[in-house]
Amino acid sequence: MLGVGGGSASAQWQRISSLPCALAYGASVTTPEGIVCLGGTSNGQKSEDFAVLLSTDKNGQLQSQNLPVLPVSLDNFAAAYGDGYIYAAGGLHNGIPNRRAFRLHWPLPTAWFETQTGAAWEELPQLPGPARVQPVAVVQKGAIGSNFYLLGGYDPRYRKAVANGAFYDPRKNNWYATSLITTKILSSKESSSQQAPSPIVSPDEEGEREICLVGASAIPSGAAHILCFGGVDKRIFEQALDRNYQLSDTTIQTAVRLAQLREEMYYYMTQVPSWYRFRRSLLVYHTITDSWAEVFDSPLIARAGAAVVPVTSAAGSASLSALVIGGEEKPGVRSSDVTRVDIAYTAHFGWLNWTVLILYLLGMVYLGYYFMKRASNSSEDFFKGGGRIPWWAAGISIFATMLSAITYMSIPAKAYATDWTYYPMQICILLVSFPVIKYYLPFFRRLNVTTAYEYLERRFNSATRLMASVLFIVFMIARTALVLFLPSLAMTAVTGINIYICIALMALITILYCTMGGVEAVVWGDVIQGIILVGGAILAAVYLIVNTGEHGASDFWQIATDHDKFRLFLFDPEHPFDFVNATWWVVILGGLANNLISYTSDQTVIQRYLTTSDEKSAARGILTNGLMSVVVTIAFFTIGTGLYTFFQTHPAELDITMAKSDAIFPFFMMSQLPAGLAGLLIAAVFAATMSTIASNINSISTAFTVDLWGKVHSRTLPKGGASDSQTTSGNESPSLGEAIGVGQASTVKVARIAGICAGLLGMAIACLMATVDIQSLLDYFNTILGLLSGAIGGLFLMGIFFPRIGSRAALVGFFCGTASVFYLNFCTQANFLLFGFVSIVVSVLVALVLSIFWPQKDEQPGLTWQTLESPLPTSPKGEE
């Protein structure tokens, strides 16, 4: 065994140990616990039972520990580690091709090393198709989760290289074939121009060619790429296999033919290395689009049987680095060369794109300043916009707020990786609009509340209001962090600016803009931002469709339909009640529940209901948002499908170092769109982000000022937040500042300070999130939504529809509902979309049962659906 140490200039190879026995053609994988060495052969005939872990002890000394051996001894096979398993498949068993595959849960339990019991290899379904000798193996993320990929190899029985790969999906316990290993010939023709002509094979012609992966090595790269280094030429290799077979087959030999074969063998073994056409190009496989490409060409990696080791890059160096060690430079001739390969994607934002983006940001800051004078001395203006917002603007504002960068980037990324199975959730927004308008909106408008949680105090008690408001604030801070992180990730990918600088800039600009002008600036900012982001999405969708393949829209449609990219519902007849995957009923239930939560208990949305002049206008705004969600979101799913079709027909255009799948859309913006248009779309990402963050910060400051600070400083309990001039049902209501016994200027000052603090805290959490590996931020967001806010929606459902439920039963039901989703998240495999639904159902059912023992004692005039038209109580409900 050899090791290398020291810096790049002083690195020296050192002999550090020897293996327990001399073996060749085994497999080794690197794990956090050390190097696992498996199988091999000592004589080229018999496969050996061999499995050891090589690691260092506390003193830094190398140690060898025995591991469970494979169920069958193997050589010339491939192994890989990832997602808690070591996989092994293919190869030979005592000279016989093997189609069996195995995996071992890793790391092993400590008891194994003490008792040699408690761990064993698990046999997987048999490999599909022919046997695979000398394949390459990698564990890499696919469209949904990680898979075990076994690519290439050859079947000695048919003397043919295997033309494709296969991958094992652990979620379905099944193998699936990849596309054929074919690529377009490098246009530069470097490869053929520097290689000696061969009388045995003809030169490649223009077009696609088949490639074999025999004698190659592979490593994962980024979020969804597999890089294949080296390997033999398919046609030369297959002719060599056939020649060897004929030399060993005595039934077809004649003296003349035998002499001819020996002459060909001599000629074959005595050529210069370039004649053999060992692969000089880096062959890249993309797991999502199932496509192959060659990305660069170098004679330094033209070896077969080399080891490829990823290395950690120093700060500021290449995005991906690997060492190509040893191998053969030609058949029978080993190489001691070591080549370092550095790969990086470099993006330049450009002055024109910066100009577009800066103009947009300055415009948003000016908008906040414009409304600052109108909101600075009036709490009614700051929190409700004075009731001056038109219904259509309120609807667009709700849409822009709920859209966010999560939709703008993650939905295209989700549709790009999978299909349209999440689209029915958008239809659920429109469906939920009708019960929200009929059953919920009247309470928020007629009670003249400033925050949604004031209703909970009137219906239950102040403890319920405070708890719900605090949880809302916690959730909004988490959401702020997430939607800060997403565009910062995009900007880092497309400009190279440090992600932490991006987060800080985004947060500070947004804090300045939203705390200056209050909710009116936020709403009109949402309108402008909504126009920008919708226009940008339509432009991107059209560009992707037109530029797919050679025939534009027809290729887009053909590829998308061939790969089932428009599928709306996932249904498995064998598992109709599958609650792990995003099946049709999981998406529908989750969409209805999560949207009901957002549109009935989310202060950022409910605050928009209160900015219009009357209840009818608010209802129109809600319907406007529902219709926009159904129609406009089609553009975002079309973008995702377009990204798939575009990059499947242009696989070499992908960034093989892209670490986050959610960055695919901004990467497309900067790598494919002309300057200026790319800046406009990046501005649209900023617009989606700022509309959401501004609403979050404004609603946090409202909830804190009204529900927390206002309660502490109140001299009289507020009946609502209307200003001196606004009336409700003919009765004047005091302003918020008057209601809590302080001036309006002081109230607005507290609200601004609360908004600044919330924004800074969200910024800090976003910086922490930048260090976490999250494959799908859309999934992550919906998980947080279900965990933190589901049972709050249950509280409003209890209050409005179940007059028998009192405060004690409601609180216990709330905690039971919250506990149920934490149990689902940490102890089951239930899909995150179900969390909100389960939380609502459990909280309401528990509260109903407990209401038998703790019924609501007092009547609730005007606070339940049954008594909506009754006169309101003169003061909020106290403690039970």
Predicted feature locations:
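Low-complexity, intrinsically disordered or signal/transmembrane-proximal segments
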Residues: 194-195, 726, 744
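Kelch-like beta-propeller repeat domains
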Residues: 9-349
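Glycine-biased, low-complexity coil/linker segments
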Residues: 3-4, 205-208, 720-721, 737-739, ...
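Short hydrophobic transmembrane-like helices used for membrane targeting/insertion
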Residues: 4, 185, 200-201, 522, ...
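Intrinsically disordered, low-complexity proline-rich tandem-repeat tracts
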Residues: 191-192, 718, 728
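Membrane-embedded helix-loop-helix hairpins and adjacent transmembrane boundary segments
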Residues: 344-719, 741-880
